[in-house]
A protein has these predicted regions:
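S-adenosyl-L-methionine
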Residues: 1-65, 104-146
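Conserved SAM-binding motif I beta-strand of class I
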Residues: 91-96
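Conserved class I S-adenosyl-L-methionine
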Residues: 66-75
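Conserved SAM-binding loop of SAM-dependent methyltransferases across substrates and taxa
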Residues: 78-89
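A short SAM/SAH-binding and catalytic strip from SAM-dependent methyltransferases
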Residues: 150-162
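C-terminal substrate-binding/active-site "lid" region of AdoMet-derived donor-dependent transferases
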Residues: 159-215
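Conserved short alpha-helix immediately C-terminal to the canonical SAM/SAH-binding motif I
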Residues: 79, 100-101
Length: 215
């Protein structure tokens, strides 16, 4: 198989993301907080993306210049940073309810600014200009207004049926053409047309992923 012409830059970006999130310990942070708060709701079980696998997933969502990306339940921001660094988005936003994960995500944003400033000049300018497009919101994705989304990612593996149904009903009011990336679960609704399905690598192993487009 012929190697992609952009592979060297993909590899560079992946390495930068790995260095940025080294020592992140997001899963342990989530476990400690949930245990301390005696939170037994399985919806908050923590899982993460694989950087290159998520790049492949996003490519199948057909991102356009200036698109707006949301990660619903964004943890410490891996999917948000991956979307922002690999693609030319106008906004990459993570919505996270748990305070320590939200705090870590914002700390990552500060760390990224400093980290990018120490890269070679050509890479420094490429990645520093992405920083203003990245933001994190502490809120419930069922409450927050993300109507400006063009692409949404949901790790739906542990969501309850009632939460999932509420979220689908909310997303059904989004603009035509909005793409919804879903890990594990499916959407049964007249407005959602499936445009991709495959098995992709996540932190917990191989996972079915579907991408829908709103009619």
């Amino acid at each position: 198989m012929k190697q992609r012409s952009d592979w060297p830059m993909l590899e560079k970006t992946e390495n930068i993301l790995k260095k940025l999130f080294r020592g992140d310990h997001a899963k342990m942070t989530s476990i400690i907080y949930r245990n301390f708060r005696r939170m037994t709701n399985k919806e908050f079980v923590y899982g993460e993306i694989d950087f290159l696998s998520f790049h492949n997933i996003l490519e199948n969502a057909q991102p356009k210049l200036g698109d707006v990306f949301y990660d619903l339940g964004s943890g410490t921001g891996k999917a948000v940073f991956t979307a922002a660094l690999f693609f030319d988005l106008s906004k990459a936003c993570g919505i996270e309810l748990l305070p320590p994960l939200y705090t870590k995500a914002n700390n990552q944003l500060k760390k990224a600014t400093s980290f990018f400033q120490n890269l070679k000049p050509d890479l420094e300018s490429k990645y520093l200009e992405k920083i203003p497009t990245i933001q994190f919101i502490q809120n419930s994705f069922l409450s927050y207004d993300f109507h400006d989304a063009n692409i949404i990612y949901i790790a739906a593996t542990c969501l309850s049926d009632s939460t999932w149904e509420s979220l689908i009903n909310k997303m059904a009011h989004l603009n035509p053409g909005t793409r919804i990336i879903v890990a594990t679960k499916s959407i049964q609704h007249a407005r959602f047309e499936i445009i991709y399905q495959g098995i992709e690598l996540m932190s917990w192993g191989l996972c079915p992923v579907k991408i829908y487009r709103l009619a």
